[in-house]
Amino acid sequence: MIQKHAIPILEFDDNPQAVIMPNHEGLDLQLPKKCIYTFLEEEIDRYAQEAGAECVGEFISATKTYPVYVMDYKGEKVCLAQAPVGSAPAAQFMDWLIGYGVEQIISTGTCGVLADIEENAFLVPVRALRDEGTSYHYVAPSRYMEMQIEAISAIEQVLEQLGIPYEEVMTWSTDGFYRETAEKVAYRKEEGCAVVEMECAALAAVAQLRGVVWGQLLFTADSLADLENYDSRDWGSEAFDKALELCLEIVSHM
């Protein structure tokens, strides 16, 4: 039932059925339960080719076609897909993957830091502040999305087994890359946000509505810690390969 509100983004309909469902095309496609869904530029395509993964389908958007790969990892089939940047397209593609069989998903990608955190450090978001729009179409309005314990546990278990240091953080999920004003950044820091990115809250909301498991491993890129001197650094490029390898290990523990 729809909950009406003067502000449209705060209106929510809890009916999981919609006029257009993710699998409305009726494709002959059955994806494995486990999935790596990453924000790693072309790293997924390169890795899929090197690992001999099979391209089993495509997600076609108005501007780009995203290959969907399946590979064997430690005796299990795992789906690999490159996530588009931004809450709306990332949520749409992930919802489509779920519609065709995916149930356990690990994402990875960069984040900007609001605190003094070195580049290429691994972080585990446990809560996301919902300053994007997409999550409000999947979960009733609230200030935060809480991450799923099952996913957090799998991520942290692998990091600890491999001796990789990490921190649990609250992240600020925003649609406004060029609207991270000095006052907003300061406000988010006061509230406890250590990093900023664009998709975490939305993907957590998709997973909650669809009843699947999703978690994210972030690694640090640019820095907004000094409001007077923005530092793009090297966008976390040194961590790309390691992050993908970690995701495969994490999803195998789920």
Across the structure, where does each feature detected by a protein language model lie?
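Accessory terminal and edge-of-domain segments that mediate assembly/interaction
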Residues: M1-I106, G112-M254
